[in-house]
Amino acid sequence: GMALCNDLYGNLMDIKGFANAYGAYPRYWVQQDDGTLVYGSTTPEMKQTLEALADLYQNGYLDEEFHVNDGTKAAEDLVNDKCGVLYGWHATALWPLQDNLNQNPDADWRPYQIVTSEESAEVTPGINMMTSSWYAVSSECEHPEALVELLNLYCEKVFDPELNEYSYYANPGDGLEGVWRLSPVSLNSPDKNQQTAKAIAEPLKTGDPGDLYGEQLSMYEY
């Protein structure tokens, strides 16, 4: 069946990609042809989505208890070969799909374009803003430059290729959490995941990390 958890819009085993196939965009404000905005959860296309999900549920393709299963519980079924398809985000390949492959080396997961409904020839997936948070400094702050200094220090410790201290601060291994999580500030390049995917593609084929460093080396080793 299709993996699904009770967080229907949470990126992991959710229904957003399924809804996009019907031209529905739950929790998005969608611009209409006349320039007005409509809330995506209230459109006729969303009603079609729910009807299709109800049909899957009634025919046994969805776990009867998905509404009480969080992501971790739903992932257990996937890892134990009880699911054959899921909608998810980029990190899904790292977890839980990798756990399933570790347990069942014959598992064969592949990415596909979002399947379209009969009424839709192509799908535009709903995506979030690349910038998800901002920092602001009060005009009454005695040392406003401290924010920039903190950000510079964060970049130096996590990203500097000469220091190459990413593993120490971000991914020490052995089940330990990286101390970067303790930082009061953080930032990332908006396209870092795309750049990492391109950078490690060839090394994964050859088995030679070459000059990879930092997060890209960590992803290669993972």
Where are these regions (language model features)?
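Short amphipathic alpha-helical coupling segments at ligand-binding clamshell hinges
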Residues: 143-153
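Short, solvent-exposed loop/beta-turn-alpha elements that line the ligand-binding surface or hinge
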Residues: 26-44, 117-124, 177-198, 202
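Conserved small-residue motifs centered on glycine
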Residues: 149, 157-222
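Extracytoplasmic/periplasmic solute-binding protein
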Residues: 1-34, 82-94, 105-106
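Short helix-initiation/N-cap motifs at beta->coil->alpha
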Residues: 67-76
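A bilobed periplasmic-binding-protein/Venus flytrap-type ligand-binding module shared by bacterial periplasmic
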Residues: 128-143, 162
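Glycine-centered hinge/linker elements that transmit conformational signals in sensory
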Residues: 35-64, 113-120, 201, 209-211
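Ligand-binding "clamshell"
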Residues: 96-122
